[in-house]
């Protein structure tokens, strides 16, 4: 069994998305993309962080800024093999989405520590890039250590770890 995770950094405004919410879990009906035939993958989850910011200027100086960041799941880019998909694999896919939300929370936390400066745009872009890098690294480590969901023990450990981390950053959760 093999599962692929895709991280989407740039997507079109016309893409159908599901925003992460703690009371809503993914279901197989959310995976609407076409199954790839040249792979051993059972499922593909496409998720990513949408990020934008605005900076208010007064007398040629930045005086305030606002940031928006969300964890999104892309149904039309996500798919699963109907003959092989099961609850265990769906839970593995959900955790990919949860890891994306965790990194949104980390991004919001780091943004909360920033102070307005004339370099704020650069700081925000660098922070976003760093969080996306960390997100990709964690997603890769997750699939590697769980052997794409095959290793049940590691899957459980990862599930507990992400649950703990989400709780740690709960102040910065998506609404």
Give the positions of each predicted feature:
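Mid-length scaffold segments of soluble, non-membrane domains
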Residues: 72-108
């Amino acid at each position: 069994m093999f599962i692929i995770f895709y991280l989407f950094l740039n997507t079109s405004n016309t893409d159908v998305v599901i925003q992460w919410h703690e009371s809503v879990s993914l279901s197989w009906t959310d995976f609407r993309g076409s199954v790839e035939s040249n792979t051993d993958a059972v499922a593909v989850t496409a998720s990513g962080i949408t990020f934008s910011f605005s900076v208010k200027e007064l007398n040629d100086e930045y005086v305030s800024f606002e940031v928006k960041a969300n964890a999104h799941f892309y149904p039309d880019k996500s798919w699963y093999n109907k003959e092989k998909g099961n609850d265990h694999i769906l839970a593995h896919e959900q955790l990919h989405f949860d890891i994306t939300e965790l990194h949104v929370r980390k991004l919001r936390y780091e943004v909360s520590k920033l102070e307005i400066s004339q370099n704020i745009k650069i700081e925000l872009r660098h922070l976003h890039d760093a969080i996306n890098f960390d997100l990709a690294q964690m997603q890769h480590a997750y699939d590697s250590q769980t052997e794409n969901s095959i290793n049940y023990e590691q899957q459980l450990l990862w599930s507990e770890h992400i649950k703990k981390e989400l709780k740690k950053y709960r102040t910065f959760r998506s609404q």
